[in-house]
UniProtKB/Swiss-Prot annotation:
Family membership noted in the UniProt record: Belongs to the bacterial ribosomal protein bS20 family.
A Pfam family reported for this protein in Swiss-Prot or TrEMBL: Ribosomal_S20p
Keyword Cytoplasm: no
Known function: Binds directly to 16S ribosomal RNA.
GO CC, alphabetical: cytosol; small ribosomal subunit
Gene, per the UniProt record: rpsT
The protein, known as: Small ribosomal subunit protein bS20
Keywords from the UniProt entry: Ribonucleoprotein, Ribosomal protein, RNA-binding, rRNA-binding
GO molecular function: small ribosomal subunit rRNA binding; structural constituent of ribosome
PANTHER family linked: 30S RIBOSOMAL PROTEIN S20, SMALL RIBOSOMAL SUBUNIT PROTEIN BS20C
């Protein structure tokens, strides 16, 4: 356990950030999975789910949770699945 006050505060803020980041990543993965499930089921709201998944990927990238190449790769694969 840290003893210095600033170190204690830093632990607290890093735990909050870790929870926030995990939540954001989970939201991105969930959006992608929802799109994939809807695609397999042949749902008619595929456009909205596709846009939501792309938006979630972009949001995760802009917040620094995933790197640019991963964002581009995920969006490319999602677009390929959407086109099929």
């Amino acid at each position: 356990m840290p003893i210095i006050k600033s170190a204690i505060e830093r632990v607290r803020t890093s735990e909050k950030a870790e929870a926030r980041n995990a939540s954001q990543l989970s939201q991105m993965r969930t959006a992608i999975k929802k799109f994939d499930k809807a695609k397999l089921a042949g749902a008619d709201n595929l456009d909205d789910l596709y846009k939501a998944a792309i938006s979630a990927i972009d949001r995760a990238h802009s917040k620094g949770l995933i790197k640019a190449n991963k964002a581009a790769r995920d969006k490319s694969r999602l677009s390929a699945r959407y086109a099929k």
